[in-house]
Amino acid sequence: MCYADSRPGQKHKSFEEVCRAIDTLVAAEGQPDVLQLSGGEPTLHPDFERILEYALKQPIHYVMINTNGIRLSNDQALVDAIALHKNRVEIYLQMDGCDDDVFQVLRGQRLLETKLRAIERLGSADLNITLVATLQAGVNESQLGKLLNLAAGKPWISGLSLQPATYSGRYFTPEQLESRITAPDCIRLLCEQSSGELTEDDFFPLPCAHPNCHVLSLCYRHEGKLVPLTRFVDAASNRDLLANGLSFTRDEGKRLAQLYLARNNCCGPNGCSTNDANNNCSSDSTSQSPAQTSAQTTAQAAGPLVVLDKNPAALADEFFAKAIEKQIGSKQMLRITITSFLDAYNFDVRRVMKCCTHHVLPSGHIIPFCAYNVLYRNGHVPLPDLKHPLVSDIATRNQPQ
């Protein structure tokens, strides 16, 4: 299974080509939120470490490495080299389930031991991981609860990404279209397999994209448990705070917490501080914020995910105080995302027009992810001429060796 149709016998892009693509992204975005190095398998590129170093010299918040983890499970030197940049690198690790039969069907090998070894090796190096599962009906839809438990138990796993199978590239099986897994299926399965600890109300669309493309749930880690932020945050009324990104630095976390508290009248006259978060919005306050009210009304049905011996309003105060103190980072959160990619059978121009995930090509083109996979990757449609002069200039200039 590979939407990129990767296979033996193909060639790597040169170091110079990859650098041109990175420069194109920076020129277009200024300070990109995330750059993902993908493939094929990027860790097999002969210049992989040079490419990573080049990317990290650019004004990019985070660099993700999209990998099957096989090399990382065995190559400590490579893990150590990546770990030098652990504050700006995240491993986007292919992890389709917690049973070997799943890997045998989807990947042609029994890879569970290899994957678990990679997870432990990366955790020992203090590298953050997002587990990425491709979901196929009849194969691994029963694995979501196991993956959630795996992620919840290891604080260096900062994300769980669920991706229903896309019928393009090296996974073209139209006879299985009737059993396609959808984003609502994923939400239902997560709720069922977490024994109701997650609820449908814990999920909301990622604002930067079309609502049918990305669904998100953010969970706060507290005393070994996960607490969805929706238990004490009014996400529906504040989605615009997440409008331009998905990955947040501690500085950005502080800024967002202050904005949220200010909107909900939780701050003092001089703005939001740690004391304001604790005092103005504490459980002892006679005038509670909307966040606290939401926390109290949902806690009764929250299940064992929520710490039951702690006042939910106090839990909200704790979270916001830590965020303002810049103590909320990747290891204090778990990000659950559901991404529904497009193929020829469900292609939707409206979704493509709202896409916030793009392929960046050495030619200077920046193309919506699914449009590239469906239309341009295999040459079904020729790439359009470049019209932006800055991008055109970057695409044609030489890169230093």
Segments predicted by a language model, with ranges:
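Local cysteine-cluster metal-coordination motifs and their immediate loop/turn environment
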Residues: 1-4, 268-276, 280-283, 349, ...
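Radical SAM/AdoMet-radical enzyme domain recognition
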Residues: 19-36, 45-164
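Canonical Radical SAM [4Fe-4S] cluster-binding loop centered on the CxxxCxxC motif
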Residues: 1-16
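A short local loop/turn or secondary-structure capping micro-motif enriched for an aromatic residue
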Residues: 9-10, 235-239, 375-378
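Conserved G/P- and acidic residue-centered "switch" motifs that form tight phosphate/ATP-binding loops
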Residues: 41
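Short, solvent-exposed loop/turn segments at secondary-structure boundaries
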Residues: 11-14, 104-108, 172-175
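C-terminal target-recognition/interaction regions appended to catalytic cores
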Residues: 315-401
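Radical SAM enzyme [4Fe-4S]-AdoMet core and its adjacent flexible, acidic
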Residues: 124-330
